[in-house]
Structure formats: structure tokens, C-alpha cells
Amino acid sequence: MNNILSNINIIEYNGKYNKKINDFVNLSMHIFIGRPFKQREDLINIQDYYIEKGGNFWIAFDEDKIVGTIALENRNTIGILKRFYVDKDYQRLGIGSLLYNEFETYVKAKTNIKTIYLACGKSLKDAHNFYTKNGWKQINKLDIDMHFANDD
């Protein structure tokens, strides 16, 4: 792949980097889906929202810069893939795949999740292609634009 991948370090959330995570997610949401900057409920306390409920939150770093995130919200046998963003300058380098592999490995090894859902805006064609390539199937519209399911 690219040499950049050798510099990428993916860690599980450890109580650090809260401001950096919030800033990165807000900027990503603004760039990719036009959402305004604000404090996101799940990012106020990642430990309680994700970790304590059997989910997880991963951060990809290039040195000290956050370049990607992905999160798992665990609802017993149902999981929700959330906060999956890669910095626009780092896309198509394999970082999304690295994050997704961490997510998938964790789900299979450490949870009882049978089905995973995610929401994806209609305009995010690259994201749709990524999910389809990774075995996700589009399902009917629920509360927001697009939902995909992966029940492997």
C-alpha cells in the first residue's frame, strides 16, 4: 500500500484525547455531511456511552494528529457502527480499512452482536462503495437517510 500506513497507529479509547476527538468528529461531520459544530452527546463521555456498554471507540493517529475514528455502540445482539471518519487528506490510503478491521475483529471476538446497523447519507457514494465492498447490504429507510446492515 502506501508508506503512510507504517506511520498510522490505531488505539482503543483510553480516556485521553477527548477534545481532539470531539474536534475531529465535528470537523468531519461538517466537511462530509454539512452538520454544524456542537458538542455531540456520545462524545461528552465516550467511556459511558461506548466502553461501559460493551462497545468501543478507536482512534487512528499519524504521529499526534487524529486522522480517523470508528466506534461501536453495543445494544446486546445489535451493534451500531458510528463515528467512522477518515481525514479527507488521508482517504484512499487504507486507513479506513485498518479502522474497520479493528472494529470487525472486536465485534467477532468480544461481543454477542448478530447484526450491525449504520446510517449513511445518500450523497456519500464513496462510503456506500466501502460498505458494499465489505459485505454490507442496504436496507429500507429507517429514521435517517440510509441504513446498511451486516449480519455475517
Describe the function of each predicted region.
Residues L98-T115, F130:
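Conserved acyl-CoA
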Residues M1-N2:
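Short acidic N-proximal helix/loop "leader" segments that mark the beginning
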Residues N7, F24, K114-Y117, G121-K125, ...:
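C-terminal "cap" of GNAT-fold acetyltransferases
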Residues L5-I8, E12-R83, D87-K88, Y100-E102, ...:
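Acetyl-CoA-dependent GNAT
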Residues G34-F37, I95-L99, A127-Q138:
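Conserved long hydrophobic alpha-helices within structured protein cores
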Residues Y90-G94:
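Glycine-rich phosphate-binding loop
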